[in-house]
Amino acid sequence: MLQPKRTKFRKQHKGRIHGEAKGGFLLNFGGFGLKATEPERVTARQIEAARRAITRHMKRQGRVWIRVFPDVPVTSKPTEVRMGKGKGSVDYWAAKVKPGRIMFEIDGVSETIAREALRLGAMKLPVMTRIVVREDW
């Protein structure tokens, strides 16, 4: 699964996800993409599950690009532990996804296969998404 090799700090504040995506809202690599339409934290496991669903439907044809990276550490305390005594340990890594962000791109397959693959991948994600197609400009 995806996670940073090293970070400046081990733990982060939760924070909020405000506004629209400032970058990564255009198709840069493939002809079809999966665009988020709402803000959410997407875990590394969810990204991996979506990637597997997409590549499995494409049957190793074409190419997949993952455009989000889980760089936010999410902490949790063990079960049945009293409050206090410091922040919990890092449980998993997540990516903060803003509305408009392209999460996955694919290319090298027909439009019907691409749409179905992205639909299956979108089912694994906690965000509302829409499929975008590169217009030939």
From Swiss-Prot:
Sorted UniProt keywords: Ribonucleoprotein, Ribosomal protein, RNA-binding, rRNA-binding, tRNA-binding
Alphabetical list of PROSITE patterns matching this protein: RIBOSOMAL_L16_1, RIBOSOMAL_L16_2
GO biological process: translation
InterPro entries: Ribosomal_uL16, Ribosomal_uL16_bact-type, Ribosomal_uL16_CS, Ribosomal_uL16_dom, Ribosomal_uL16_sf
Classification via Pfam families: Ribosomal_L16
Keyword Transit peptide: no
One Gene Ontology MF term: structural constituent of ribosome
Gene Ontology cellular component terms for the protein in this record: cytosolic large ribosomal subunit
Subunit structure: Part of the 50S ribosomal subunit.
Function field: Binds 23S rRNA and is also seen to make contacts with the A and possibly P site tRNAs.
Homology family: Belongs to the universal ribosomal protein uL16 family.
Protein's UniProt name: Large ribosomal subunit protein uL16
Lineage: Bacteria, Pseudomonadati, Pseudomonadota, Alphaproteobacteria, Rhodobacterales
Gene this protein is translated from: rplP
